[in-house]
Amino acid sequence: MQHWSKRSLSDTNKTLWCGWVIKSQNFQYFFVGDTGYSNDFTNIQKKFGPIDLASIPIGAYEPRWFMKDSHCNVEEAIQIHKDIKSKKSIAMHWGTFQLTDEPMDEPVQLLNKFSKKNNLTNKFIALQHGETIKI
């Protein structure tokens, strides 16, 4: 995972950003965290094996020249899903605040488009605000 942290003018990268894997005997959940794409995800998969459920960020990615290292775009999010061999992924980090230049609904529209293109319909989904699902 890659990002940066800052809460005031003088504390750049004094705290760490992260993702985490929660494991039980029969289930693994991966909270990817706030990140840009990197090859770290293939290493995570090698360490933990296939993931049962992942929360993967899909928003706040434009302009790419500025956001690429900190926020993955939808195609990169799909690559993370593939890299970690997630059985099911839920999109996060989109649609709450207008943080960047892409339209608020674009990440979900692109997720639906690229999920179909990659045969991931119902495997990588975006929930509407307040929506729940059974796992």
Walk through the language-model features, giving the residues of each.
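Core dinuclear metal-dependent hydrolase active-site scaffold
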Residues: 1-49, 113, 129-135
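Cap/insert and terminal regions of metallo-dependent hydrolase folds
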Residues: 28, 35-127
